[in-house]
Amino acid sequence: MKIYNTMTRKKEELVPLVPGEISMYVCGPTVYNFIHIGNARPLVVFDTLRRYLEYKGYKVRFISNFTDIDDKLIRRANEEHTTVPELADKYIKEYKTDAEGLCAEPATCNPRATEHIPQIIKLVETLIEKGHAYPVANGDVYFSVRSFPGYGKLSGQSIDDLESGARIEPGDLKRDPLDFALWKGAKPGEPAWDCPWGKGRPGWHIECSAMSMELLGPTFDIHAGGQDLIFPHHENEIAQSEAATGKPFARYWMHNGYINVDNQKMSKSLGNFRLVRDIAQEFDLEAVRLFLLSAQYRNPINFTRELIEQANTALTRIRTARERLAEAKEGPATAEDESFIASLAEHEKRFCDAMDDDLNTADALGAMFDYARAVNTFVTEPRSKEALERAAKLFDDMTNVLGILQHSKSEEFPKEAVALLNERAEARKAKNWARADQIREELKAMGFAVEDSKEGAKLKRL
């Protein structure tokens, strides 16, 4: 598999540190609000990468953090008249609900910054001892950017370029405009922890360095996140981590592109933020996941209602093909069955070739749709048990990697819909055709179709 490495600006063969294992860290959310569609993209993209690596046989250690102490959390907690820990707990729970809706598998570990304060303090102490950081009178500790010769290597920015736009804000005690805070001295009414240079709390960048190295070691395979994190967050992570350990930090850097809404950049000023929670009121989040995978992950993607509706239609086509495959009648083996079995390897190869090419989910979806069409044609006649089983395995492998058709595996139909279906059966038994037709329309309004067969009626999602 080749992936585009932001550090080297080229596609590289993915060769893990430990054969057969992948260590991976994805920057998670600052938990002060519900997540929006922009937050959902890295969640879905890197969950898909993890799924594909596991499909290829790798053991993946997947870490994604929660930033649960930050200026934004403090402000929001004050607005909601609650504490920072209570606010963080609330939105971590909401995040997990949205992640489940988007079919993202739970991470191996979701570390919280506040659970790693001792490791953060130790890392800051190491940087001070090595001359890469310095405390100031108000309890802040700053990283000395010029002390790290490789600063700017991820973002491609030189010290000279950065220097021209840098300035020291009033009240800052840092020695150089380029320096950034590792630790912030305590302020009244803010959470604070004891440390050798006085009470305070960690800066954002040091949190991810401490947590990733604690859980994955000083050097690990993949560090990922949104494009907006390249500078300054990931650049600062590299500087402080490599300055502390003297070792390379992450070996591969992956970044997903931005999301626009109706061809405009998503921003608070435009009021066009789209919360996943709100989108879920109108659309199946599996369709949203499919939409997010419909473009190459490094490219920008445009969120529109029309495109989500198209993704919903596409998801229905895939779901229908899988249902037809499950319901296909068995028959004696034929030459056509053997021919179809032989074609499975080519379908799988096309899918994997796309995924191996820097996680090209757009082309992988194309391979999935072509396979679904082939399945639809194949199951119009009775087929051998072996052919049907092998066809189903490949279908499920593809959908499992993409993280679609996951809800149907675990989700039961709503009790209200099942009750209406049973009532309709009674109405038909009593030859009350008007009521039976009325119930069909009620179910349709709820998003379900009724399919009648010799075995009885069953529900199907529209």
For the regions a language model picked out, list residue spans one by one.
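N-terminal, positively charged nucleic-acid-binding surface of large information/translation enzymes
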Residues: T8-E13, L17-E105, E455-L459
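Structural preference for alpha-helix termini/caps and helix-kink/transition segments
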Residues: K265-M266, N272-L462
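Alpha-helical recognition segments enriched in aromatics with Gly/Pro capping
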Residues: M1-Y32, D47, T97, P118-A326
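The substrate-binding groove and active-site-proximal loops of carbohydrate-active enzymes
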Residues: N78-V84, T108-T114, G226
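Short, glycine/charge-rich beta-strand/loop segments that flank catalytic centers
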Residues: F66-D70, I92-Y95, E105-I120, N138-R146
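Short phosphate-binding/catalytic loops that engage adenosine nucleotides
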Residues: Y58, H132, F448
